[in-house]
């Protein structure tokens, strides 16, 4: 797993407001300055009182006190020398009493009034020098440039249209001077914003240091026993939280200091670029625009129907004050145009919060440039009253506005004109943009309506039946009257009101009013007093930002509040206040929610959020049934984030005993990213338990509702408080101070999922010991956490058990498992407080369906359902899980009962520092023992005879098969997670550890016997089934293995041939076929010759044995002559023919017949020998003939003279040609 490294993109709300000099910025810095003046006044009066009143009075009181204690009892000197009966001890008693009482009084005085070292005064001085003085210096610079800028701007715009002011060169010079002053003013504003953020943190730091100065005096160390007694332990714990919080904030500010400087520089650079004036003289010529009219075009082209961004800024507004006579004045107002709505903001009379007037749709407004107005850059807005249908004089309002420059004048008129053009081009009247363009929106709350007494402000501010009194609305359904008035008076600290990016005098009221606001598709005063005047919708990070347009397009424009929600009766009042703040912060700035999700806040806690390994921020977290909402606001930066609970795999708290890291919660997402949260002012174990419960609840098939969740949370809080009280009562007074008893606390989450106090190393030693004691064991490694594997194996939806058991009949309807039942022993031991037990039901099948039971006689166990128990005996969350199964008693013929116990151990792989490697080992331990009888399970049989040893070997084999099946099914489950250890997916697929809500308390004996033995009887018939199965199994195994080997050899050969080039393969095939053909012919010729030779040798050896044989060669011509002569004698000689016809010749007939047969055989052999001779000489002779023939052809063609003159050569060549033709005619 890895941590996210990409840094967050924070929102610079305060800096952005300072760069635009918005009314929100001015109101916030003015209100903060009033608070700082009060703080400064308090500090000076306090220091003056301490130095001039407290110290002299304290010294006088000390002297009076010492005098009183010295005279409280007689002097020891007076009591000595036989003046009292107990002379050895009474004077000493008086002396010690006087001294101890004086010490006690000094200690008490130090607790109440402080010490004489003036640490409190030093802390005040440090606050003044480190924070207050730098702030006032920045404020003084800011006020200087603000007055300079406002006065110059007023004088510049107050100039009339005389000849000198109309000169372009003069306008350019004045504009450049204004920009230079505004640059200095914006820079001072950004510096002041930074000083305010630092001041806030330093003030918190001062308060902590001051409280700690006083708190240290509340710790008393006894003189004799040296025991430490803390008089205010609750204050000590709270102060510890505050100290850690401040230290984290200071670290955050130190890390953000460079980012803040970069943000200031970037914003200042952007502001300068935005207000950079033109250097062209013609751009300052007012005469060129005097005749320009910005009228709406009659025809609107769809090609120009493009979305326009909004516009906002300061404008001077012409108005009158007084009654008789009326005096014309020009007042500065913040005007805006957004989402086709035009409105005006103004500062309150006290200049400490923002007010608003009516807002008008752009279709009711007509803009006109006023070149004849005495002042420069003026234009008129004519706003028609939507409620009037005529064109009379009193049906509209004329507002004369003055821009600060000619560029702003053009920008305002062009923007107003283009927005109206776009609104008119909308054909659908139900389009939300068109609906907004035709609306008139009165102030929703009287508290934020404009209170200015000028005539134009009064005309622009109206009220209707929709205008509400915020205080009364909150009283009705949401808050108590005392809390509302405390909010109005800024005394609502008991409500834990969160800090907003902009803080004005009415920020708290605005925070609760946003909950009732109708819509935020346009700026309103409540948003201006919390988030400022800018549109931060695209950067709220709750959903994907809008693309391509800043104009929000909701489905409809509703007149009812999108925040409204009816709180149920079971919802606590404290959470109701938190929920209102939550909705205001997260959804008032985000327009992507037409209706705010109806999720109620179930938990709120302060934290230091570490979203990656580079950043950490002080934040506030709101938890609903489905999400965690994180909000941060520090040092001018803000951020909103919504985290889906299903995206989080697990939440664990840091196991380190250090008090800083003990606040840490580790959260791991499904994509492997990991982030941390340090919880403050709330027990982090309770937070971790609640978050983990919500994660698992969301993954359930039927999750619990908000009411059930709140009930569970309440029970958890009550249990934690009770346990804290018990722990405190059991600790001594000295331990209350010296020991972090909160670290001893275990939450309900730990109780349900952790039942041992043993350390991981002790549990690892236990695992090794059990492995040594086991008869056999198997171990596998999995690349997931131990908790994940535990759910996979033993979750209530997991099918690993009982289907993986060797004795279970696969696919039977009787196979199921029950919920886990929590059993607490009446007498708890130190190592285990409770156990979880469940029952596995399955149908017994001792031959795994290989031989059908219908073919055999059934006994008592066939088709019998068994109930096997599993018991979780050791749980160490995230490290170690131990489950026992059994016992099972198996009875074989002619053998003692065999007792079988199985133990599953899941152990996390950890480093030497105790850090998890996100790997775990699964060990399956089998223990076999022959016992004397079923009633004597503890009596072990030592001497085993042959059958019992054979059965043990069988059992070992079946254990291997069962282990392989468990391993296979487990890995099948893990493959479904795609190598992502996401706890939500694990829970969805494998279920929870479904623990029943009720707990049974058993005595030690009964709890130990909770798992009754399962008895299985194997008779001779059953064993014959098993033997048959094994025989067939082994024979099949041999056949299959042989087939596998042969198939593997064929595949290897095929693979080798498949790797050869195809062209080469085809050539080799053709060559092999050709060679086989010639080899066949050679073999045929060889055997023919061999046969003739054998026949001749047999004849010669048989008839002429023992004689001298004379060999004579016979050529082919001789053979032909011999044959021909013999035929002539036989056929043509008339003498021999007549002799043959004579009757005397019959006596030679038999002899002649034999001779004829011999002759036929000899001729046949001669013919064979002739062919053999031809074959022997034919090859070489043919080559010679071809060579000679080629020479003859060459001579005939090239040496023609020689050919003509040499007749012998011609005869020889003709003989060669004839012989070549004869040989060519002979079949091969």
Curated annotation (Swiss-Prot):
It is a single-pass membrane protein. InterPro entries: AH/BAR_dom_sf, PH-like_dom_sf, PH_domain, Sip3/Lam1_BAR, Sip3_PH, VASt. One of its GO terms (cellular component) is mitochondrion. Residues 308-421 form the PH domain. The gene is LAM1. This is Membrane-anchored lipid-binding protein LAM1. Keywords: Endoplasmic reticulum, Glycoprotein, Membrane, Mitochondrion, Transmembrane, Transmembrane helix. The keyword Isomerase does not apply.
